[in-house]
């Protein structure tokens, strides 16, 4: 394990403008190479947690460190460099539907190019080859020139995973990556995330609705209820009753572990 956490949250709270508490007093350390699943009811704060780590949401108090550097107050170039190390995978795939699969995967390299080059699709031959190889790794090399909106939901999510592979981040934040997929396709997508974790050493934090997928793929499980961490432990040491408590445990007045 690394001496410093890859992700660290210190006393993090998020209160929305309407007064809704998104996160409350979160303290977490996630080390390099971990595969962490976050579980909880819809509205519990799972998405807020992930989006705060990448600073898609600004937190109300506390601090978030990425590989030892604060993202909370980072600006300009420093913020861009920190975000370059964080790949995001969303439940709605977040692809440019009318663009080719290849172009969507190349988006993973945008942070490494000046804006004018990406606007005119001026990617290097080397990066185009890397994009093709990334598609090979998720078994979509035959779709390289297809439009993204011609693909099935599962194929689109695998394009999103290839895009993250192209970005080569230290961290992958997957926000309900299987929510709109059938069970068989969900397992395929989770296996792709497992590949990125085990083969490339990327730290994965995934929000999941499915307890079965969480148990199958997670090495560590974090339970969120009403914006608080109510459980944090190794999956192999976590009895099924814990999941029942997380989903049926009331209003989340338990303190964070």
From Swiss-Prot:
<dbReference type="InterPro" id="IPR050086">
    <property type="entry name" value="MetN_ABC_transporter-like"/>
</dbReference>
<dbReference type="InterPro" id="IPR017871">
    <property type="entry name" value="ABC_transporter-like_CS"/>
</dbReference>
<dbReference type="InterPro" id="IPR003439">
    <property type="entry name" value="ABC_transporter-like_ATP-bd"/>
</dbReference>
<comment type="function">
    <text>Part of the ABC transporter complex PhnCDE involved in phosphonates import. Responsible for energy coupling to the transport system.</text>
</comment>
<keyword id="KW-0918">Phosphonate transport</keyword>
<keyword id="KW-1003">Cell membrane</keyword>
<comment type="similarity">
    <text>Belongs to the ABC transporter superfamily. Phosphonates importer (TC 3.A.1.9.1) family.</text>
</comment>
<dbReference type="GO" id="GO:0005886">
    <property type="term" value="C:plasma membrane"/>
</dbReference>
<keyword id="KW-0472">Membrane</keyword>
<keyword id="KW-0547">Nucleotide-binding</keyword>
<feature type="domain" description="ABC transporter">
    <location>
        <begin position="7"/>
        <end position="251"/>
    </location>
</feature>
<comment type="subunit">
    <text>The complex is composed of two ATP-binding proteins (PhnC), two transmembrane proteins (PhnE) and a solute-binding protein (PhnD).</text>
</comment>
<dbReference type="GO" id="GO:0016887">
    <property type="term" value="F:ATP hydrolysis activity"/>
</dbReference>
<keyword id="KW-1278">Translocase</keyword>
<dbReference type="Pfam" id="PF00005">
    <property type="entry name" value="ABC_tran"/>
</dbReference>
<dbReference type="InterPro" id="IPR012693">
    <property type="entry name" value="ABC_transpr_PhnC"/>
</dbReference>
<protein>
    <recommendedName>
        <fullName>Phosphonates import ATP-binding protein PhnC</fullName>
        <ecNumber>7.3.2.2</ecNumber>
    </recommendedName>
</protein>
<keyword id="KW-0067">ATP-binding</keyword>
<keyword id="KW-0813">Transport</keyword>
<dbReference type="GO" id="GO:0005524">
    <property type="term" value="F:ATP binding"/>
</dbReference>
<dbReference type="GO" id="GO:0015416">
    <property type="term" value="F:ABC-type phosphonate transporter activity"/>
</dbReference>
<feature type="binding site">
    <location>
        <begin position="40"/>
        <end position="47"/>
    </location>
    <ligand>
        <name>ATP</name>
    </ligand>
</feature>
<dbReference type="InterPro" id="IPR027417">
    <property type="entry name" value="P-loop_NTPase"/>
</dbReference>
<dbReference type="InterPro" id="IPR003593">
    <property type="entry name" value="AAA+_ATPase"/>
</dbReference>
């Amino acid at each position: 394990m690394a001496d410093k956490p890859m992700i660290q949250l210190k006393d993090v709270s998020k209160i929305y403008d309407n007064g809704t508490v998104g996160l409350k007093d979160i303290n977490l350390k996630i080390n390099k190479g971990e595969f962490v699943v976050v579980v909880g009811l819809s509205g519990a704060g799972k998405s807020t947690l992930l989006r705060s780590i990448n600073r898609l949401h600004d937190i109300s108090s506390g601090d978030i460190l990425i590989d030892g550097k604060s993202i909370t107050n980072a600006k300009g170039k420093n913020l861009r460099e920190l975000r370059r190390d964080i790949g995001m995978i969303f439940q709605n795939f977040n692809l440019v539907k009318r663009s080719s699969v290849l172009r969507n995967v190349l988006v993973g390299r945008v942070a490494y190019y000046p804006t004018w080059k990406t606007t005119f699709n001026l990617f290097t031959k080397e990066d185009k080859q890397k994009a093709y190889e990334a598609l090979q790794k998720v078994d979509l090399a035959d779709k390289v020139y297809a439009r993204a909106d011609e693909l099935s939901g599962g194929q689109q999510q695998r394009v999103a995973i290839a895009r993250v592979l192209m970005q080569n981040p230290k961290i992958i934040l997957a926000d309900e990556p299987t929510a709109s997929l059938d069970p068989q396709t969900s397992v395929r997508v989770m296996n792709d995330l497992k590949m990125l974790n085990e083969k490339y050493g990327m730290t994965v934090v995934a929000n999941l609705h499915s307890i079965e997928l969480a148990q199958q793929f997670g090495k560590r499980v974090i339970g969120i209820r009403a914006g608080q961490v109510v459980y944090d432990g190794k999956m192999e040491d976590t009895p099924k009753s814990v999941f029942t408590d997380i989903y049926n445990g009331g209003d989340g007045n338990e303190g964070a572990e």
